[in-house]
Amino acid sequence: MKTVWSFIGLHSRQPSGVFSGFEAAEDWIRRNKLSGTLSEFPLDVGTYDHAIANELFAPKKDHQNTPDFIADFSSRLDHFHYEDGARQ
């Protein structure tokens, strides 16, 4: 499975960088002394579908199959928090 790494700043609602590799992402975060979260996401598949296919999540309530729920769903494969460029 191919993945990408997405960085979202501490006070942001959208990614400020998307990287094909962890090392490139972390180098950029350190160099710019950024604070926020670096998250890994599967490529070419939604996180909701990925989580169900890999038995990481199973909808149990009706609302968990709605477009709003699916659009807000996140099952980041891995994630790291940073403060001023340093991993926490």
Task: For the regions a language model picked out, list residue spans one by one.
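Generic preference for well-ordered secondary structure
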Residues: T3, G9-R13, F22, A53, ...
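Short aromatic-glycine-(Arg/Gly/Cys) micro-motifs in beta-strand/loop hairpins
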Residues: M1-P15, A24, L34, F41-D44
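Short, mixed-charge low-complexity intrinsically disordered segments
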Residues: R31-Q88
